Amino acid sequence: CLRLRIMIMELLNKIVKRGQFYLPVFAQQATYLQHASKTLCAMMETMEMPKWRSLEKEVKACEVQGDALLTELHEQLSEKFMTRLKKIDIQAIAMSMDELLDHINDSAKSFHLYSPDRIDPQIADLAQYIHAQADALRQMVSYLGDIKANYAQIALQCERITELEHAADDTYEEYIGFIFNNEKDAIQVIKYKNIAEQLEAATDAAKRVSDNVRKVILKHME
């Protein structure tokens, strides 16, 4: 009887591991997000166009690899029948992470596109918020292997991402007021406003990832 129980537990462990095939995908997406956001922050530390182009290519490489990873996940989902999360939940999390990566890439492209004459502190702050959110996402993903046991840690990182998004909103609104009051050239106003909008949109995208994860963990705690 004991031997049978051990055999059943071993079988269940294999099924669970097989059912968690999506976790390495989430982890890799989080790695791309962290590298891309760190590279975006590095763009704030230089005014050299060649350096911007080089760093933008690094972000783009992460975005391309992220797209390929998402395609691979979709293929795996079509073949898998047993997972600890529902397919729709896995897709929602993965697609929102990919959307965040797209927004980071768009933010990096905006520097190359608009070639700003300066980088205001608020712009650099927005990039730092994105990087901090990416770090929180990486930590959050590492806990998804056992949602019930790690509920508090996951919820904490979700809350951290939300707080960073709120801080980014405040910074964005302050910056828009700043440029309209201090920038006399209408073209420059549009330029800096668009750059700030891209960055703020990325912080919103990070919150959407967090919101999708919140929905999943709440289902598991019902």
What are these regions (language model features)?
Residues 1-7:
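N-terminal amphipathic/basic-hydrophobic helices that include classical n-h-c signal peptides
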Residues 7-222:
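Cytosolic, long alpha-helical scaffolding segments
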